[in-house]
């Protein structure tokens, strides 16, 4: 693959419009030539605004919904509060860098040495860099910052800061995202130093976003894993409200501190692998991880010691027994790391040979990295309470010691103390959702980009969560929900949708299996609505949403494929579309159907197939009130005209009720084909 050199080359490649499916509608004119700015004026050319707003490169996702739809107040003080008070302003950073004795920054070297070539042995990459630089300087090719400005400004010369922040939030990013620190610092500085503090012109806007332009461009192009994040969060909110009505269950009371939580607490937080965030309910209330820490410490152990070493001491099979049973497998090992016996043994493997204080600090630092440095705390009251009421766990510990399940030289009582400490680590729904997203993202924290866990550790952890993570309910959960998850007696459910997102659902009332009643209901409803189940077919799924797809793009591709097949006379392609239950009467932006196109081109076989096999309506009118018969007559295709004329006599219109319209399409297509 050719090496890309310099930002100008990246801009050149990104700004090239994509070719349509099958080679149709391929644009030969670069986007930049359509977007030139008129001389002698400060307002952007209409072409540039239209291109920035409508061009498929942006995906239509840059429009802000305005301050009235969840946006911010336009007052500078409230905007400053929204942007946060953390971080070092750019001016202070410069002063710190210019302290006496500090070495000056190295001068940038040349981009390419003369005569340097790419992987194919030519200098195409260097020429593209030069061409891109020249086009940007001449104004022929708008920069990414320009396109982003015009996308949000929608024809205005200045952007209100609150409008930019509202548009940013609609993509799922937060102003507190560490990846946007430079942008937020510059916005804070701009609001403090400019007279027109709540408005950004193009130059100020470019200055603010240029440090994070790649992430912002990706967000506004709707290139995140969930493109239409606002629609997805509305579904999450509906599922939350539905689960909130569940009133069963009982708050765990065998650990006194847990019994103090209100049964009405209920929160859900989502974090995708791209760092899109959404929270609803009591998501900032700290609670203890309890058993939800078991997969996390297992992942740490495998990351540090490897799979083979860890599983010398613990098995991989579901036990089929209660999580706190005194029972081992036929090899005298705990069945898996998700039951108490297995978790105690895994605890003994972490940082062997050091004292408990250092071990605890090590695990806390690890969990902080997984949570993207969001809240991870410790409840000493819960720790003391659990230690005082931990007779069953002490019994398990002595049984494990008798069976020589620990590494040689292990202090069993000290390990149980460490075990109780880890169960008493506190999180919120928001920080735990980032931990789950780190597992979903292959071990990379989505909001810091830091590698935390090895792929091996993540894979093994998710496998065990899938088979053993929900106590005695694990088999049913794997059957109905089909996703890796781990529950805890504090009421949390750590849910992972691999390669998509992580979630934390928290509600203290538990069912008889020890799982959160509201959390289980939410997970069931989520998989019923979206095709997240591990065995949902992504190509031929039933009536389920796929948040990973962008609905508009799929409809556009469907229409293009259908009309292009009719244009080229490809009956075999049309047969495939009909068998896949595609609507053979769908229209383009001119209200033209496949029958219009086939009649205009004179494709007799296509017309016969659409009429006889698919039983499409022969009377559709386009925006000029032309029917397929008018098209055939206009272009002199008399054989097609005759077929349409004969079919119109025997055609019987069918009802268009919404209920069963899709089934009607399927049966109509199948009956005709058979």
UniProtKB/Swiss-Prot annotation:
The modification N6-acetyllysine is found at residue 316. One of its GO terms (cellular component) is mitochondrion. Kidney, brain, and intestine. SUPFAM superfamilies: Ankyrin repeat, beta-lactamase/transpeptidase-like. Residues 1-54 form a transit peptide. It comes from the Eukaryota. GO terms for biological process: chemical synaptic transmission; glutamate biosynthetic process; glutamine catabolic process; intracellular glutamate homeostasis; protein homotetramerization; regulation of respiratory gaseous exchange by nervous system process; suckling behavior. Residues 89-101 have a biased composition (Low complexity). Residues 58-71 have a biased composition (Gly residues). The keyword Repeat applies. The modification Phosphoserine is found at residue 657. Enzyme activity is increased by phosphate, due to increased kcat and increased substrate affinity. Keywords: Acetylation, ANK repeat, Cytoplasm, Hydrolase, Mitochondrion, Phosphoprotein, Repeat, Transit peptide. Residues 56-123, 652-674 are annotated as: Disordered. The record marks 72-73 as: Cleavage. It is an enzyme of class 3 (hydrolase). Belongs to the glutaminase family. The C-terminal ANK repeats prevent the assembly of the supra-tetrameric filaments. This is Glutaminase kidney isoform, mitochondrial. It comes from Rattus norvegicus (Rat).
